[in-house]
Amino acid sequence: QYLNAYLNHDKVEVLVADGKLLPTSTGKDSLEVNTTLEHFPLHIANVFIPDELVTLAGDMDGELSITGSTEQPLINGELILDSVSVLSRQYGANFLFDNRPVQLKNNRLIFDKFAIYTTGKNPFTIDGYVDFRDMSRPMASLNLLAENYTLLNAKRTRESLVYGKVFADLRATIKGPLDGLNMRGNLNLLGNTDVSYVLTDSPLTVQDRLGSLVTFTSFSDTTTVVRQEVPTVSLGGLDMVMMVHIDPSVRVKVDLDASNDNRVELEGGGDPSMKYTPQGDLTLTGRYTLSGGLTVSYTHLTLPTT
């Protein structure tokens, strides 16, 4: 039985698959398929990403050979990312991916110092592999390394949860099944970091003294219209434990509301432990020492009584 398939996007052929299925009397059929990708657009995957949490751009090229039994096929070949980027508007981050080929050898996707850039010249590199030999339970074993990496360099927008500049050193490992990864390592926040976090669910409420009497709202003024709940990015079943060193010169600011009129500013350092659980809980445990003081800016602040 022969197979011939192709995929067009905007009237342009972007994927071709040719091959044959070889049935046997034992029922353990085998196959031989060659697939070619030519400028396969990754943005078509954006429709499957909920709430546009991240946006893919760029093309994928490459050739794949699929052989062996239909129950346990072997995949070999290479994939080339052509100007591929991943944008997260909430976190103001745009990651640019290496254009060097990524090899697929016997169902292993191999990363050889695969580089990811943002706005700086220093890359974030990945070494290791993702193993698909057991299709029901793909496994990963990856080493992550970055030195003086520009993790964030973004201005504030209406969608921002984090903005400012973050520079970091990172050395970490990621291992385990893709639906339950374990990440361990060290993160060093460098002294030129100046970052702000927008607190969307705050127990502190900023309130005008006349707010309980009358409120005038102009629907053409987008700053006074009720803001829709901002979707958050989930990291799936990731179990992360990172030892963090924060340089004493690091500046961290927390916007207590979307107006940017009420904020807390911290300057200091420490060595806390950062944990992220598979349930989505993020905690920091340890000592943080103020070196440049604490600044609180607000109009009228109401604290909860319970």
What are these regions (language model features)?
Residues Q1-E63, E71-E78, D82-L170, P177-L301:
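Interface amphipathic segments
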Residues T302-T306:
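A short, hydrophobic C-terminal helix/tail in secreted or cell-surface proteins
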